[in-house]
Each structure stands twice: as C-alpha cells, then as structure tokens.
From Swiss-Prot:
Protein name, entry field: Ribosomal RNA large subunit methyltransferase H
Designated gene of the protein: rlmH
InterPro entries: Alpha/beta_knot_MTases, RlmH-like, tRNA_m1G_MTases_N
UniProt-annotated location(s): Cytoplasm
Main location: cytoplasm
Statement: the UniProt record of this protein carries the keyword Nucleus: no
E.C. code: 2.1.1.177
Length: 159
C-alpha cells in the first residue's frame, strides 16, 4: 500500500525533519510512505484577497499535478471532519479492504488549500479548530498515520 503526503514548500527545520524521518522509518513496516513537496508561492502580509486566492490556486495546481486518478485523497482542512484515532484507523483499514492501495494526504501552504484541491479530495480531515503551521502538520499527520497502523495491527503503541 502507498501512502503519500503532499505538502507545500520545503521543510527546513531540522527538528521537524527528524520527527518525520522517525515515523517514516516506522511506517516502512506497513506501507510505502513518501512525502512530496511542491514549491510554494511568495505570500507577503500585504496581499489582497484576490492575490491570496491566486497564490492558493497556483499552489493548488502544483498539488493536483502530483495526484493520479486512482488515488484516494484526504485534504487536511480546519473546517473538515474531526475523527478519533480509532475512527481514522478503521477508515484506513476499510479503504484498503475495498481496494484503495494509494492514499494521499494533502496539506495546504501558509494560506490554505484552493477550492480545486478541496473539490478533488474524497474526504476532509480536521485536527480540530486550532490552526497548525503546515510544517508541524506534516509531523502530526505522520504520527497519526503510524498510530493508525499500530491500531490496525493490534500493537500496544496506542493507549
Ligand atoms: C497555516 S494552515 C492554513 C491556514 C488557512 N487559514 C486555512 O484555513 O487553511 C496550513 C495548512 O495546514 C493544515 N492545517 C492546519 N491546521 C489544521 C487543522 N487544525 N486541521 C487540519 N488541517 C490543518 C491545512 O491543510 C492548512 O491548509
């Protein structure tokens, strides 16, 4: 099974990289895990709404270029649906049981995801109403995907 996270911009901070590398290593037992980075657009503070929409649209096109038709896509969105870790694990298990072997998660850039990306998504996941930095979101999501596999496989990691 293939799990892909698409993120906007390069991850620079060593501590995020180290955390993600740890979960990527652990996930190697359960799936082919990859993180795909697409270039971000400059988004200075002074942008108008139209300019912000353009930034999201451009980043969105780059994200959509990395998604194939067969992929089941989760968009990470603050206003999406919240789940518990157990519910998420059940959902992943069900998707694989019903033949989805390519699952892709999309995290927006500093301004968020474009309407086109949200439209392509098969489901939206919210990690609550807090706004998390997109780099940190990659780490938190990697951990939750790992947690889901430990739940599916009955390992004692999840309490
Ligand atoms: C800095 S946030 C963008 C904030 C933007 N105002 C928005 O509402 O999307 C960057 C990305 O991280 C992800 N993200 C941040 N907090 C999240 C949360 N609580 N739940 C789900 N995704 C989140 C989303 O993919 C978002 O597009």
């Amino acid at each position: 099974m293939n799990i892909k996270i698409i993120g906007v911009g390069k991850l620079k901070e060593k501590y995020f990289k180290a955390g993600i590398a740890e979960y990527a290593k652990r996930l190697g037992r359960y799936c082919k895990f990859e993180i795909v980075e697409v270039p971000d657009e400059k988004a200075p503070e002074s942008l108008s709404q139209a300019e912000m929409d353009e930034v999201m649209a451009k980043e969105g096109e780059r994200i959509l270029d990395k998604i194939k038709d067969r992929e089941y896509v989760y968009a990470l969105a603050i206003k999406g649906k919240e789940r518990s870790s157990e519910e998420f694990a059940k959902e992943i298990n069900k998707l694989t049981t019903y033949g989805h072997s390519d699952i892709t998660f999309v995290i927006g850039g500093s301004l968020g995801l474009s309407p086109a990306v949200l439209k392509r998504a098969d489901a939206q996941i919210s990690f609550g109403r807090f706004t998390l930095p997109h780099q940190l979101m990659r780490l938190v999501l990697s951990e939750q995907i790992y947690r889901a596999f430990t739940i599916i496989n009955g390992l004692p990691y999840h309490k």
